[in-house]
């Protein structure tokens, strides 16, 4: 059984129900739907309440930091009490797109880390072109951390491993000349997750199509090859890691 540890069910070409059904048929036993703003997180909590094997997170993407208010933080705190919410995120820093100033992103990130510490929920981290600052801020985190859509070579892997952080590998790890792919054997297998980030980052061999949770099988197959283990072994390993991180009621 596989777990798609990071996806966006409300942005897919098909309904969440259809996406989950297709994923189950492909061998994906659970899906983590990730929130990117308050409204998205509320809808995610509603999905988790009605769809089997779907769990959600509550968070505000750094792209949305420019409009972030104290009321949003209060809303996230309330959502964190919902039974289907298993983590806080995605939150973090993104210096690539520039949708929000670094100052606004840092203020949101600091509040999110504090809220995670208060609620004891793990953090789902978005970091793009901001790894040093991201890691500096995470020094105050007292909860488990997953670096979603992890990108980086030996040095980044070493730092994540030293801190005991989980790393989520998405479809982009399958692309040609991926520095991250070369570093997979250096990663802590007990902190390894596979994800889609659907509808984005479709893995080979479906690159160019809109991504979906079912496609996590391709990323898992690639990662298994890099580690020199069987696909079933990789599936069990990463599903167990997802269960441990998010506290999922899965038999793995």
Task: Indicate residue ranges for each PLM-predicted region.
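Mid-domain alpha/beta scaffold segments of enzyme catalytic cores
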Residues: 1-252
């Amino acid at each position: 059984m596989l777990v798609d540890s990071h996806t966006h069910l409300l942005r897919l070409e098909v309904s969440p129900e259809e996406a989950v059904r297709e994923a189950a048929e492909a061998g994906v036993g659970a899906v983590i739907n990730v929130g990117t703003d308050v409204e998205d997180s509320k809808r995610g909590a509603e999905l988790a309440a009605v769809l089997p094997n779907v769990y959600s997170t509550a968070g505000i993407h750094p792209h949305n930091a420019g409009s972030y208010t104290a009321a949003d933080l209060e809303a996230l705190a309330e959502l964190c009490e919902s039974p289907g919410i298993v983590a806080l995120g995605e939150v973090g820093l993104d210096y690539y797109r520039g949708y929000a100033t670094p100052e606004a992103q840092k203020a949101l990130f600091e509040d999110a880390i504090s809220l995670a510490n208060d609620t004891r929920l793990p953090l789902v981290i978005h970091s793009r072109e901001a790894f040093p600052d991201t890691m500096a801020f995470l020094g105050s985190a007292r909860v488990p951390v997953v670096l979603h859509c992890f990108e980086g070579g030996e040095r980044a892997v070493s730092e994540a491993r030293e801190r005991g952080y989980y790393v989520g590998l998405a479809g982009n790890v399958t692309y040609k000349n991926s520095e991250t792919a070369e570093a997979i054997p250096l990663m802590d297998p007990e902190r390894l997750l596979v994800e889609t980030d659907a509808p984005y980052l479709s893995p080979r061999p479906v690159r160019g199509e809109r991504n979906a949770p079912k496609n996590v099988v391709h990323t898992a197959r690639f990662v298994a090859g890099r580690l020199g283990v069987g696909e079933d072994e990789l599936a069990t390993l990463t599903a167990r890691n997802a269960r441990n991180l998010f506290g999922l009621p899965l038999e793995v």
